[in-house]
């Protein structure tokens, strides 16, 4: 073991936290809990600057420490105040450890970073000896030995891992000496050299043996190279000392060249000797440039109402001639007679997919000049229907009059190659053939526009790998593809190839990589990324290889967050946003290494039975996504193929789940390690057409995975009307914005607006309202006076409807972001303001929500638009009601709440086209109007009330996710003992108060909607934590079933279904944004008495007060809490969406006065929110004048509280327990309003030790609440 020298650098101060996020800093300070606790972290807004964070009265105060031109450091001060400058950070902190230095409080208690076991563990699980990059010959040799170490018997493992041991010794000790030497000006690394020489002693002899053998073989084919080998061997025998390592590298380089060229030389020599021409094997699958005519056998779907058709032959064949631009509809008659009609591409008006019947398709034909007809056909399978749609879209695109495409197809492939070169035929991977959701044989003939290949453990050099891919594409598509980007990090590679015709449409190509390997310094794990613009649409692609090992979930999560933050791709002006918000479409794929948390034998049994649902429920990636730990709002197609890892090499029949390591036998359960996820801006078009794996490529222990996507793109818009005059200028105007951010800070905030449609980013003024109902959250608001009117560079609606606006909420004290989001302008266009509501995120974590009212004003001269190709296909919810089974994903990632005004109704055309009967005809005017408008809603602007039934809200109720741990008496979440023992479904069978004027027209909610909405595995085609309202959100409950209650102090998150079912009372649904959905401002109401909650015995863990329903059920104390794969309980690991939480902070139901008077009573079942016992936060809100109609926020009543007529002292005196007054007041319980939330632990902290006295006090409080 190498000894650590005396020159080791001193450890950093306890208060110094490099690379710590603002949110994590606030959590550390909250856990410390003492005034004067402090730490210093890197600034998120200024490179090279720091942020001093101080806790005082439960609020975190942040001070920026900025370097000046001379690299002196100073705390940023108010204008006119002379800053105090210091050479080093410790000197600066030393000053502020003294009292009265201008900070909010003296720095007293440095806070250390909590170091977990995984933080200290620098090994990489299974990969103790990572394969080295393939660029030099030495790395090839290392890769070979690495392969030996996994497959050789245990007695050879120690020798094989010699380099690993020496490397670890160097990283733990001697590298610090080299670092010190470099700081002192050294140009070499003696300790590293020594480490490498000792590691490579045996390699010298092995290389010499191989070279001697190759010398003999070389003499047969090439005398020149043989003599060079001889000279090299003689030279190497005389070398030693400092030059030894250099000559070893030279030998290895020659060995590499010799090995790669000897086969070619031998082949040439043998060909010269042979007089016959070698036979060339035919290509496996040559694709003609001309796509052949494809024929589909279908049946006509006859409506029962059309009795004249019943009994007649309804068999048809549909022939698609892509090259000729026509569709032949042939009806099969008796006696071999046929009747056909030919429709050119311009006569096919629309395709309408049925959601309820997956193999049904409606086709609307233009029959005559101004008439249309619809026919519904039943295909042999859903796959055949999709192939037909793809061919027709290709035909439309090919014969379109547009110069630029509206839609492209993208192939994404990911494969861990296992350090073995790929087999030559890669057809099944390229053609998306194999297991899972695959393309129909008729559709695989269609070449994709862009191919993106991500590989891991790829030992092939870049040039050779790109050539292999190009040749494979040429072989199977008969088209030339151009490589536009290749990025490599060790053995992690990404290659992007595009059709030659698209080469000039691609610009702004960017590439980047991030290392997350051992100690985050080695590139054996990490990510490579590529970004570019395709005309006006931005794309990002990330290929990653994350930490292996079944138990390394936290480290994989951290790998993802590091990549998200450090990968430098996309527009540099968007550096305030992580890469998940920088691109119209972001694809993230690779060997993510998330495993299955289940016994190996159970896993194998489920795989043998092809039952994947139980496995997907214990898939670590799905579980972590459900908890919002990673891939926030990303989507993944449904998995319907077996786990892709770990197979026996050479076949796909057997999983090899044991692996010999230096530390012993390791179990690798079969898992879906290789995945493809994506995230797109709201109101954009993207459809996943295939997602599966191959079953015939067997060189690696992983199977290659493929996914194909249909993606809408925009052109580089050029206005036909030229630049707008001042009278024709479009405007983006905000009426108001309100945000709830997760922070213990109480600074002021402003908003920055970014968009490609703006010349430069714009800033708002600071917020003019600010309040807090919870110490860990802040509600901030901006009125129209504080918000800037934005002027787009182009005013045409055709341009603006494809644009998006990025918002970031930043603090005035540190100019650091507290949350970012993206809004689509498409739904905001109109003469009246539209409302938006979406989530905020920062560094991959959900940090709150934001809502507001805005409009995009477009001058009438610029209103002309056209139908996009992808709008040509719509989705029909069918005449039977809602969709059944799995449905297509919603097109939006945020909710648009449409007011019930004439402005919204104008967007609904005439009757739905999907309702037109088979022979129904209508005028072309009506048809054109409807076609466009229906598609706008189906594809672009999904109603909260019409969204997919499978799109659910996460209701994970983990207080640790949305409160800062360690803050006493502040939690507002379910106690662990009322969490159900399975995944937590959201509220079911909810009811809401109807809007004014709708009494008697309401319909009861669907009783079966809850089952359709909740999926623990997140397997529907949607972002797992999507916050779009589901169908039953739009259902309006009966008038009498509405619960009328005043706004609580702190409304709790939604209760899980199990908690509701255990209650004796029947609760209605708390309507989400009822005031917004109804388009009305609720009438102001006076505060009403709100009964307190009955806390469960013992309160909530961590000193918090749990909330529950009155008359709580008796729960078994022995019931085990819900647990996930790492053994963490639900309270520790189940995460509540911050958006769900923030909604409850900002939403209340306001009943009308008559309803309130009729239904309120002291015995009515009600929920009460929590108030806080100590240091109540004063509201700083500035009154805002609201318009009488159309305003976003209603006049809110003040927080309700326990109605009291006496002080705490008087109350205690009545009970004869006045001696407890001093203890209660000392602990902040100075008002009966707060005492309603006190628990037994709180009473003990206040000095109430006697159990009988505690019982008297709690019973008295309960009685007063009633």
UniProtKB/Swiss-Prot annotation:
PROSITE patterns: SAM_DOMAIN, SH2. Signal peptide: none annotated. It comes from the Eukaryota. Residues 1045-1056 have a biased composition (Pro residues). GO terms for cellular component: cytoskeleton; cytosol; filopodium; lamellipodium; membrane; nuclear speck; nucleus. Its EC number is 3.1.3.86. This is Phosphatidylinositol 3,4,5-trisphosphate 5-phosphatase 2A. It comes from Danio rerio.
